[in-house]
Amino acid sequence: MEEKDSKPSETAAEAQRQPEPSSGGGSGGGSSPSDSDTGRRRALMLPEVLQAPGNHQHPHRITNFFIDNILRPEFGRRKDAGTCCAGAGGARGGEGGAGTTEGGGGGAGGAEQLLGARESRPNPACAPSAGGTLSAAAGDPAVDGEGGSKTLSLHGGAKKPGDPGGSLDGVLKARGLGGGDLSVSSDSDSSQASATLGAQPMLWPAWVYCTRYSDRPSSGPRSRKPKKKNPNKEDKRPRTAFTAEQLQRLKAEFQTNRYLTEQRRQSLAQELSLNESQIKIWFQNKRAKIKKATGNKNTLAVHLMAQGLYNHSTTAKEGKSDSE
């Protein structure tokens, strides 16, 4: 780690020594030699102090975005000019680190002049100049990475230089992209997700609405809902009023055979001037009354109830049957 930190400082020192003859004439801003000396000292101190946390935490900067950036709603809304300026920030920083300025400002490549030139330049300055200074500076990877880290770190220099969090915030604010977005965006996305979940009402799962507890054997006897007596609403089938002659003929047929065949039901319907459904229902009700009065249950039902597999007892009151 110490060898990696010492190499960028040596390259920066060599880069600052090269433009010393042209430092007096290239300071178009009227800066004195003392200002250039202080700028040179600051440039020499920057790689050791500010570059280390940036390089250790972001060794790979091949892509400009991560998956978290793609999932953000504002992804793809940046203008071409903004991305151009953000992408060319490293190359312009390398230009300042090498000591050559495009407009002739700050021959020593001071950090203050670099920031001033970056803020004062309009958007067309993002394009490389005709002399090829940007391409030449970008060709040297060491100088490019060093200068880029200097400008990015100084741009977000509101915090202490030794604080890695401060340098990370500076990088994120200066470029809007980069490796630091992975951790920061995950925190922001989680906070946004929790906020949206808190705003939505509580949702119940589907099985709460679909489960029928009466279908389970452990639910006990099923209870019928008592019928609400509504005088306004008429019954679908009016109660059949049998005459005395009809009741005598039905009872005689029931004593002969409790179960009607289709032919017997049709003949009775014609003789008594009734519907087949009315005769069928009367026979069903009559069989149910006798079965309940005797109390004899089916042997299969008794066997299943003993095993706990059959329980059709009801708790509601039974309605009145058809008149005899």
UniProtKB/Swiss-Prot annotation:
Pfam families to which the protein is assigned, alphabetical: Engrail_1_C_sig (PF10525), Homeodomain (PF00046)
Span list, region Disordered: 1-59, 89-174, 215-240
Listed GO biological process terms: central nervous system neuron differentiation; dopaminergic neuron differentiation; embryonic brain development; hindbrain development; midbrain development; negative regulation of neuron apoptotic process; neuron development; neuron differentiation
Gene Ontology MF: a single term: DNA-binding transcription factor activity, RNA polymerase II-specific
Chief subcellular location: nucleus
InterPro entries cross-referenced by the UniProt entry: Engrailed_Homeobox_TFs, HD, HD_engrailed, HD_metazoa, Homeobox-engrailed_C-terminal, Homeobox-engrailed_CS, Homeobox_CS, Homeodomain-like_sf
Family: Belongs to the engrailed homeobox family.
Protein name as it appears in the record: Homeobox protein engrailed-2
Protein species of origin: Mus musculus (Mouse)
